């Protein structure tokens, strides 16, 4: 069994050694331009077209939860990967736990009004504020995949009213499910906090725009943990300036790194992190990949395969 590996920023040598240890029967090598030798599996992130084109692979693993970059490259270069080759993504591998930590900490930050107290502190102003009531602090999760379900589970502990919206209806205990475009407005109408965990598809690009934000309750909060292209940044800034949206926590952006001239940096109601809400944990990723390859070799059914038509 031959495995080729490519990631522009990861510690390639660590990965190769870890994969060799986890899959002793495999010959693992770092792919370099001009390497056309045979391979059974490819582990990639932003791979060059020539790495995959023309190969008779058993499967390709994207080294992250999102596959939008490789799918967009496939649209431009369909010869890059045979349609019959299964494409897998890292559904969790520690990302769910990280998303839970990020989402819960920020929801509690807003619920306890720490954002308001920070603004008061900036002007040396001492004033206790009325508390928010949990029953009025409905949290809506936009996108109900693996990571969305993990975030919902963690928030249930805090007894917030929860709802989710997705392409198809979900049956999560204690979570009100909305499905399809026809139910989006009803979903948004009660969301005091909107957490975006949508996949990046042509249908979801720009979905968080003026029209969507207007359907939220006044003084709502936005937490974007998915992709920057989901948010029309000018529309969000306008909603923040008007007070329609009271605060935003943004981990992802249309351009990354976020340009220094972006008004988001200095907005008093925006908090920024540099795309770190959930990063790939190498040891857990290697365990998932080695387990999945073993299942594929045995002809077993496996989880995590991407539906290329849907984009996730």
Curated annotation (Swiss-Prot):
SUPFAM superfamilies: NAD(P)-binding Rossmann-fold domains (SSF51735)
Name of the coding gene: ghrA
Pfam families (UniProt xref): 2-Hacid_dh_C
GO MF: glyoxylate reductase (NADPH) activity; hydroxypyruvate reductase (NADH) activity; hydroxypyruvate reductase (NADPH) activity; NAD binding
Reactions mediated catalytically: glycolate + NADP(+) = glyoxylate + NADPH + H(+); (R)-glycerate + NAD(+) = 3-hydroxypyruvate + NADH + H(+); (R)-glycerate + NADP(+) = 3-hydroxypyruvate + NADPH + H(+)
E.C. no: 1.1.1.79, 1.1.1.81
Entry function: Catalyzes the NADPH-dependent reduction of glyoxylate and hydroxypyruvate into glycolate and glycerate, respectively.
Source species: Escherichia coli O9:H4 (strain HS)
Swiss-Prot/TrEMBL keywords: Cytoplasm, NAD, NADP, Oxidoreductase
Localization annotation: Cytoplasm
Family: Belongs to the D-isomer specific 2-hydroxyacid dehydrogenase family. GhrA subfamily.
Name of protein: Glyoxylate/hydroxypyruvate reductase A
GO CC aspect terms: cytosol
Catalytic machinery residues: 227, 275
UniProt cross-references to InterPro entries, sorted A to Z: D-isomer_DH_CS (IPR029753), D-isomer_DH_NAD-bd (IPR006140), GhrA_Enterobacterales (IPR023514), NAD(P)-bd_dom_sf (IPR036291)
């Amino acid at each position: 069994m031959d495995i080729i590996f490519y990631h522009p920023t990861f510690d390639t040598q660590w990965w190769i050694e870890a994969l060799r240890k986890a899959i002793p029967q495999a010959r693992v090598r770092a792919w370099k331009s001009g390497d056309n030798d045979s391979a059974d599996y490819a582990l990639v992130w932003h791979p060059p077209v020539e790495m995959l084109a023309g190969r008779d692979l058993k499967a390709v693993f994207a080294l992250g939860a999102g596959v939008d970059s490789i799918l967009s490259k496939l649209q431009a270069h369909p010869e890059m990967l045979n349609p019959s080759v299964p494409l897998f993504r890292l559904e969790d591998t520690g990302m769910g736990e990280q998303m839970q930590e990020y989402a819960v900490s920020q929801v509690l930050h807003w619920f306890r009004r720490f954002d308001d107290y920070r603004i008061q502190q900036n002007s040396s102003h001492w004033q206790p504020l009325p508390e928010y009531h949990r029953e009025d602090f409905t949290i809506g999760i936009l996108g109900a995949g693996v990571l969305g379900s993990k975030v919902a589970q963690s928030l249930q502990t805090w007894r917030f009213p929860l709802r989710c919206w997705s392409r198809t209806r979900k049956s999560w205990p204690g979570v009100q499910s909305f499905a399809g475009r026809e139910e989006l407005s009803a979903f948004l109408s009660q969301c005091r906090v909107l957490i975006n965990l949508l996949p990046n598809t042509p249908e979801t690009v720009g979905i968080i725009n003026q029209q969507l934000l207007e359907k939220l309750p006044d003084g709502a909060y936005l937490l974007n943990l998915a992709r920057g292209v989901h948010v029309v940044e000018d529309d969000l800034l306008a909603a923040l300036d008007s007070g329609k949206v009271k605060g935003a926590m943004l981990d992802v952006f249309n351009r990354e790194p976020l340009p220094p001239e972006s008004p988001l940096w200095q907005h008093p109601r925006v908090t920024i992190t540099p795309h770190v809400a959930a990063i790939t944990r190498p040891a857990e990723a290697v365990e998932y990949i080695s387990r999945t390859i073993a299942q594929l070799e045995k002809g077993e059914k496996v989880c995590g395969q991407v539906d290329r038509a849907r984009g996730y």
